[in-house]
A protein has these predicted regions:
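Polybasic (Lys/Arg-rich)
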Residues: 1-83
Length: 83
């Protein structure tokens, strides 16, 4: 499950991530979609390319993997850590 800000969803809808993409919930602020795909490097890259415009809700293993990669990216740009 991936959650997007509602104002970004029209782009996601017109450029689907995968043929299995389905909208599962929508509220005043967000839209959640479901994909029936294998978690792989390409999916991780797609998620990371959306930056703060996407949040992985499920599976937790993917959410944790994205979190680890973002932590590593933050470390790469931390001026104190690079000393």
């Amino acid at each position: 499950l991936l959650c997007f800000p509602k104002d970004e969803y029209p782009y996601v809808a017109t450029k689907p991530w995968h043929g299995s993409q389905k909208k599962v919930t929508e509220d005043e602020c967000t839209v959640t979609i479901e994909l029936d795909v294998v978690v792989n490097y390409e999916l991780e890259q797609k998620i990371l390319s959306w930056g703060n415009y996407v949040e992985v809700l499920q599976p937790l293993s993917l959410r944790n993997q994205i979190h680890k990669r973002l932590d590593r990216n933050t470390y790469n740009y931390d001026p104190i850590a690079k000393r």
